[in-house]
Amino acid sequence: MGKHILLLPLGLSLLMSSLLALQCFRCTSFDSTGFCHVGRQKCQTYPDEICAWVVVTTRDGKFVYGNQSCAECNATTVEHGSLIVSTNCCSATPFCNMVHR
């Protein structure tokens, strides 16, 4: 009986973590239209993660690369040589990292 009592908190913990987890899109490489060419999947966030997507463009606005994931995320825009790398984060709704271009 003692084992059954110990399983209850574990079960509740797993239930709560699954309820708090956020579903996001995962894509290793998407194009300028947002179409995923490599690794189209869904992911579920772990604690401290949210939905994220990264877009790399040239200084004159030409699309170079994009990806989506579940990740620890800080929204930033960084210039690196002739490229601009924009990291975007969201957690408001499931699959909020859908890319519309």
Curated annotation (Swiss-Prot):
Disulfide bonds: 24-51, 27-36, 43-70, 73-89, 90-96
All residue ranges annotated as the UPAR/Ly6 domain in the record: 22-99
One GO BP: negative regulation of activation of membrane attack complex
Domain of life of the native organism: Eukaryota
Pfam families: UPAR_LY6 (PF00021)
GO cellular component assignments: extracellular region; plasma membrane
Keyword Signal: yes
Chief localization: secreted
Signal peptide span: 1-21
The keyword Transcription is annotated on this UniProt entry: no
Subcellular location: Secreted
Glycan-linked positions: 67, 74
Keyword entries, A-Z: Disulfide bond, Glycoprotein, Secreted, Signal
GO molecular function: complement binding
Protein name stated in the entry: Urinary protein 2
Source species of the chain: Rattus norvegicus
Lineage, broadest ranks: Eukaryota, Metazoa, Chordata, Craniata, Vertebrata
